[in-house]
UniProtKB/Swiss-Prot annotation:
E.C. number: 2.3.1.234
Superkingdom of source: Bacteria
Role according to the record: Required for the formation of a threonylcarbamoyl group on adenosine at position 37 (t(6)A37) in tRNAs that read codons beginning with adenine. Is involved in the transfer of the threonylcarbamoyl moiety of threonylcarbamoyl-AMP (TC-AMP) to the N6 group of A37, together with TsaE and TsaB. TsaD likely plays a direct catalytic role in this reaction.
Record's protein name: tRNA N6-adenosine threonylcarbamoyltransferase
CDD domains in the record: ASKHA_NBD_TsaD_bac
Positions of substrate binding: 143-147, 176, 189, 287
Alphabetized InterPro entries for the sequence: ATPase_NBD, Gcp-like_dom, KAE1/TsaD, TsaD
Annotated localization: Cytoplasm
Molecular function GO terms recorded: iron ion binding; N(6)-L-threonylcarbamoyladenine synthase activity
Residues annotated as binding Fe cation: 121, 125, 315
Gene: tsaD
Family label: Belongs to the KAE1 / TsaD family.
Catalysed reaction equations from the record: L-threonylcarbamoyladenylate + adenosine(37) in tRNA = N(6)-L-threonylcarbamoyladenosine(37) in tRNA + AMP + H(+)
Main location: cytoplasm
Length: 363
């Protein structure tokens, strides 16, 4: 049953390599406030391997989650009996971590007789701008992270239409792989951005994948290969070579992203009318060069850019709690036997989804 009452929701995020919990207050007028937002990054655990190791991530969630939740509740000055609901990311993600978070949420919900909200991790990213801005539906979302690159029409809570996606590598994945091939530390995205600041973006003629295509899909594997080929030709790499390669790669990503979003926004307008905003979420949206490029795209399309602060673009518990609160306000709760999901389409409610080039779109 839908409710306009204020709510307090605990959110739990364990889909990848952040162990996170937060408490959100959703007021009766639909606005929100973050009462606590605790995030423990496992970067140091995974850095020696150059990427996330699923088993290490899951074991870390087991070790850390109870303490993270206790800290979030203490910082919010809220007891479990005061909660209106417990939300957990139930997918998509690394299944071991998803199981840890969802099982913990189920235990809390069962013991305290509190509603459970099983949140789609991608929906949490999609709804976060409504926590930080007075944003009405519909709006156009650009979601770019280590596992996902999508353009999505956000029509309402639980109502999404994917307009475009990657046909190969996710954007964050491409940044990390380029960083690794150039010998930069993990996580690679911030390292590439930092190196690009002192590089010459015009030194290499890197391709702009999918430029001018009618469908707003992305492809980054060819660009990644072009960077590898140039790096191999220049071996051993000097510091300036690395900076120039990063600058050229990032510039190509920016050009391709601007073009793909231009097409995506036009498609949005044709199908749903003008969007209230272009919003961006996911870890890649913390990249300052990308944020500037998105602003220019929004202005050219006659709309505005709304973005959460960088700390809410990367994975966190506040976004899970907020998505849970938004769903709870509509009376959308889940049974305690809800299954964790490694793959979970954001637009799974769409009877005839758009055609995509391969199964990577199934995330």
């Amino acid at each position: 049953m839908a409710s306009d009452a204020a709510s307090l929701v605990l959110g739990i995020e364990t889909t990848c390599d952040e162990t996170a919990a937060a408490v959100i207050e959703r007021r009766a007028d639909g606005s929100g406030q973050i009462l606590s937002n605790i995030v423990h990054s496992q970067i140091e655990d995974h850095a020696p391997f150059g990427g996330v190791v699923p088993e290490i991530a899951a074991r870390a969630h087991v070790d850390l989650l109870d303490g993270i939740i206790a800290r979030a509740m203490r910082e919010a000055d809220v007891g479990f009996a005061q909660l209106s609901g417990v939300a957990a990311a139930a997918g998509p993600g690394l299944i071991g971590g998803v199981i840890v978070g969802l099982t913990t949420a189920k235990a809390i919900a069962l013991v305290h007789e509190t509603p459970l909200i099983a949140v789609n991790h991608l929906e949490a990213h999609a709804l976060t701008p409504r926590l930080t801005h007075a944003l009405e539906f519909p709006y156009c979302l650009f979601l770019a992270s280590g596992g996902h690159t999508q353009i999505v029409a956000v029509l309402g809570v639980g109502d999404y239409v994917r307009l475009g996606t990657t046909v190969d590598d996710a954007m964050g994945e491409a940044f990390d792989k380029v960083a690794k091939m150039l010998g930069l530390p993990y996580p690679g995205g911030p390292q590439v951005e930092r190196a690009a600041e002192t590089g010459d973006a015009d030194r290499f003629a890197f391709p702009r994948p999918m430029l001018g295509r009618a469908e707003p899909n992305f492809s980054l594997s060819g660009l990644k290969t072009a960077v590898r080929n140039e790096a191999s030709r220049l071996m051993p790499l000097e510091r300036q070579d690395i900076a120039d390669l990063c600058a050229g790669f990032q510039a190509a990503v920016l050009d391709a992203t601007a073009d793909r979003l231009k097409v995506g926004l036009a498609l949005f307008r044709d199908r749903f009318g003008p969007p209230h905003a272009l919003v961006a979420a996911g870890g890649v949206a913390a990249n300052q060069a990308i944020r500037r490029a998105l602003h220019d795209v929004a202005v050219a399309a006659g709309t505005v850019l709304m973005m959460p602060p960088p700390k809410l673009c990367t994975d966190n518990g506040a976004m899970i709690a907020w998505a849970g609160a938004e769903r709870l306000a509509l009376g959308l709760t889940d049974p305690l036997d809800t299954a964790p999901r490694a793959r979970w389409l954001l637009d799974a409610n769409i009877a005839t989804p758009a055609k995509f080039a391969n199964t990577r779109a199934g995330f």
